[in-house]
Amino acid sequence: MTWVSVAAMLNKRLGRRCADEGAAQRVVPALSEADRALGRLDGLARSLPNPDLFVAMYVRREAVLSSQIEGTQSSVDDVLAFEVDAPGWVQPADITETVNYVRAMNYGLQRLAELPISVRLIREIHEKLMQGVRGNHANPGELRRSQNWIGPGGSTLSDAIFVPPPPFEVENLLSDLEKFVHAESDIPALIKIGLIHAQFETIHPFLDGNGRVGRLLIAFYLCQKEILIKPVLYL
């Protein structure tokens, strides 16, 4: 089943009465509240006298938090010191990963003006994100050519918690995902971005950096759809 067919199926289901009234009663108010909150957030961003100045710091904070999920230890102060080449500053070994996140975010936002979310953009973002990063699995911008898996340290393919699709399916699955991103549908934007993120992480198209690219896609989608004028929400 492709994501285009999934979109069609969801459209049909959303057009009917929800079989689980309890779930509908929980989801609809939460979705409405989230939509209102996004509207208020976008309004605040538009009201700032210099939103780009605010966003510049906000992006760096998000870069630190997102990279910390992957185990890095750098701080916002480290990022700023790196950017100005502060004298006497001791550079953390993993600062490159955090600074690359800032660069990938800024690059992606600029590219959206001429290139919508696509497999090509995803690969370009990954290339920026993984440039010069330590380890044997960086492969900037390259889709994986070997099987990966997710599990605790020392786990193998046989006892992994989750095994993504085999590498020969990755390109077609990403193509399906790209079609789903741009398909016209009645799926609310916040639900759709959740589906996009979940499917991207399920495909796990790279050997490393999937989590960070997936989180960047959320911000890119909200800006591409003009739900937010600036990337001021990270999930």
Can you say where each PLM-predicted feature lies in the sequence?
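FIC/Doc superfamily catalytic core
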Residues: 1-235
